[in-house]
Amino acid sequence: MKPVAAALLLLVAFGWQQPEPTPAPPKLFAIVFRTGPAWDTARPPGQQSFMKEHSQNLGALRKAEKIALGGRFGEFGLVVVRAADLAEARAMLLADPAVAQGVFQADVHPWSTIYEGCTSASAPPPR
């Protein structure tokens, strides 16, 4: 009887453990920047208030591999970020000092990749 009890105890201890849930893969979100009410039209972009802090914020997101791509087009900026959900993507946006101070306004939209392999929600491989 003792061997059976020991075997059952081992089954309970090791055999019936629930596997660790795997986190959901990140999704992509497009953040579209445009000038805000605090944008000074008399100054060039590099001399705007909070531009240095804006660049530092984007640099930190790049270092954390949260940015999939980014650039400017016309009078707009576009940054595609990796996030678990829309709330996390919005939090990244709201953490930007230039947005918080009204130098930029921005919108967040879910990003749908059409051509697979061109942009990935997964972080790039280590260098």
Model-identified regions with their sequence ranges:
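Bacterial Sec-dependent signal peptides at the C-terminal "C-region" and cleavage site
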Residues: 3-23
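Conserved, structured core segments of small domains
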Residues: 18-127
